[in-house]
């Protein structure tokens, strides 16, 4: 096999691996954060309590829905 062709194929394989790895990692992280959001309802309730608000279930659901809506954009 020609040396130039071998080098070309190695470079192409590396580029394909880079692109595939990037998109694979991106999809994994999106799924991870969708399944395990960085903030939970308990954290939001504690934050509301610290701000002097009474954390009702309705308020918690509104905040969680807003966060989920922002993640989908």
UniProtKB/Swiss-Prot annotation:
Topology class, membrane: Single-pass membrane protein
Location(s), subcellular: Cell membrane
GO CC annotations on file: plasma membrane
Pfam families hit by this protein: UPF0154
Keywords assigned by UniProt, alphabetized: Cell membrane, Membrane, Transmembrane, Transmembrane helix
Bilayer-spanning residue ranges: 3-23
Family: Belongs to the UPF0154 family.
Name by which UniProt lists this protein: UPF0154 protein LJ_1506
